[in-house]
Amino acid sequence: MDVTAKYELIGLMAYPIRHSLSPEMQNKALEKAGLPFTYMAFEVDNDSFPGAIEGLKALKMRGTGVSMPNKQLACEYVDELTPAAKLVGAINTIVNDDGYLRGYNTDGTGHIRAIKESGFDIKGKTMVLLGAGGASTAIGAQGAIEGLKEIKLFNRRDEFFDKALAFAQRVNENTDCVVTDTDLADQQAFAEALASADILTNGTKVGMKPFENESLVNDISLLHPGLLVTECVYNPHMTKLLQQAQQAGCKTIDGYGMLLWQGAEQFTLWTGKDFPLEYVKQVMGFGA
């Protein structure tokens, strides 16, 4: 790719950042489409995020992706949020229109699209959702919008717990989906929830390198063959949770699906063009 002064810059702001496949994926897509943009990753944490946003405006960047730990904080630094992003309380995409920043969340649409592409109909189904950060809440919100009957959130009683309760209340008030939030330490409640669930989704970073030997499911017998197990983590490709699920006879969807579909939507938001989906699947080796 020959980058010239006519190229516009798109970023990714996250910490840590080196594990991300987004720069490779987006740059391959941009080059294939022949578009005058380049995508770069920037190591940005909560403390440096405000300054990074000022830099985005000053450099007239087209926009940026936002990942952990900045997804919720980023809502405070945009001029407009989509209705879905308001429901989530977190964004993963910022589009810069001449200094006016719009915030979107494509995590939820990406993950639900990956589930649908597998042939699974979520309408009327029950999901057990692990975590209450930006990815989890995005998936929960989009799932509720698209027809999930019930979402059972399980997360540790940490700094996200009160935010999870507030998220559950927003979804309950604005959709027909029933959302509950339970401390993950309550393993009896967790076991009972899994027994009647249709989908188990890991929206946490548990299982991501260098913690690839970890899983929030401590007992593989809690997983049953009728359960669809989906993952947000894609590094490693086969997380411990997915290994457990396959051993238990569950159908699984890896983190590449969410990465691909959320990235496709981001691409269109930034460029106004269609994402070269089949090409990217081939060159990135996603295969699904």
Swiss-Prot record:
Q: Provide the GO MF annotations for this entry.
A: quinate 3-dehydrogenase (NAD+) activity; quinate 3-dehydrogenase (NADP+) activity; shikimate 3-dehydrogenase (NAD+) activity; shikimate 3-dehydrogenase (NADP+) activity
Recorded catalytic reaction(s): these are: L-quinate + NAD(+) = 3-dehydroquinate + NADH + H(+); L-quinate + NADP(+) = 3-dehydroquinate + NADPH + H(+); shikimate + NADP(+) = 3-dehydroshikimate + NADPH + H(+); shikimate + NAD(+) = 3-dehydroshikimate + NADH + H(+)
Specify which residues bind substrate according to the UniProt entry for this protein: 71, 107
* Broad class of enzyme this protein falls into: oxidoreductase
The answer on whether this UniProt entry bears the keyword Amino-acid biosynthesis reads: yes
Q: What InterPro entries does this protein's entry cite?
A: Aminoacid_DH-like_N_sf (IPR046346), NAD(P)-bd_dom_sf (IPR036291), Quinate/Shikimate_DH (IPR022872), SDH_C (IPR041121), Shikimate_DH-bd_N (IPR013708), Shikimate_DH_fam (IPR022893)
Binding site residues for NAD(+)? 132-135, 155-158, 205, 232-235, 255
EC?
Answer: 1.1.1.282
| UniProt xrefs under Pfam families | SDH_C, Shikimate_dh_N
Per the record, the GO terms for biological process are: amino acid biosynthetic process; aromatic amino acid family biosynthetic process; chorismate biosynthetic process; shikimate metabolic process
Which pathway is this protein engaged in?
Metabolic intermediate biosynthesis; chorismate biosynthesis; chorismate from D-erythrose 4-phosphate and phosphoenolpyruvate: step 4/7
- Keyword annotations of the record: Amino-acid biosynthesis, Aromatic amino acid biosynthesis, NAD, NADP, Oxidoreductase
What does the protein in this record do?
The actual biological function of YdiB remains unclear, nor is it known whether 3-dehydroshikimate or quinate represents the natural substrate. Catalyzes the reversible NAD-dependent reduction of both 3-dehydroshikimate (DHSA) and 3-dehydroquinate to yield shikimate (SA) and quinate, respectively. It can use both NAD or NADP for catalysis, however it has higher catalytic efficiency with NAD.
The record's comment on protein family reads:
Belongs to the shikimate dehydrogenase family.
Q: How does it assemble?
A: Homodimer.
| Protein's recorded name | Quinate/shikimate dehydrogenase
Organism expressing this protein natively: Shigella flexneri
Q: Which gene encodes it?
A: ydiB
